[in-house]
Amino acid sequence: MSLELCNSTRQAIPNKRLLQAIRMVVQGEGYEIATITGVYCGNRMSQRINRDYLNHDYPTDTITFCYSEGKAIEGEFYISLDVIRCNARHFNVTFEEELLRVTIHSALHLTGMNDYLPEERVAMQAKEDYYLQLLKTQKSISPQKSTDNAIFSCNS
């Protein structure tokens, strides 16, 4: 089992909280981690991936690729910290709260949830709210021991 977070920017991110959020969602939805890579990047990388894979020529908050079909998740996601910063101001929340919400959103995509249709978006937002609140209540609790390999890396 492998869970790797890569921050390719100079913006500090709460690595341990992000790992906790991903694990919480994956386990809470009844899945396990095989290999998950999360890349926290800037707008240039986000726009390039969005253009190359989805034919959308603009940066976006998150792009998720799920390669698994069973209960053991293999996948990766890319989150633009520039978009997160902008959205945090727009929604009047902290950078960290928006980052956690979008990381939870990405993890939900890895478990198979979609948000294409209006009713799917409502269900996705409800799950985001649930896990974000759960994460807030566990803030003072030390993270559980995990058997997966958690790696933090940075490619500047």
Curated annotation (Swiss-Prot):
GO terms for biological process: rRNA processing. Pfam families: YbeY. GO terms for molecular function: metalloendopeptidase activity; RNA endonuclease activity; zinc ion binding. Binds 1 zinc ion. GO terms for cellular component: cytoplasm. Its cofactor is Zn(2+). Zn(2+) binds at residues 105, 109, 115. It is found in: Cytoplasm. SUPFAM superfamilies: Metalloproteases ('zincins'), catalytic domain. Its main location: cytoplasm. It comes from the Bacteria. Its EC number is 3.1.-.-. Keywords: Cytoplasm, Endonuclease, Hydrolase, Metal-binding, Nuclease, Ribosome biogenesis, rRNA processing, Zinc. It is an enzyme of class 3 (hydrolase). Single strand-specific metallo-endoribonuclease involved in late-stage 70S ribosome quality control and in maturation of the 3' terminus of the 16S rRNA. Belongs to the endoribonuclease YbeY family. This is Endoribonuclease YbeY. The gene is ybeY.
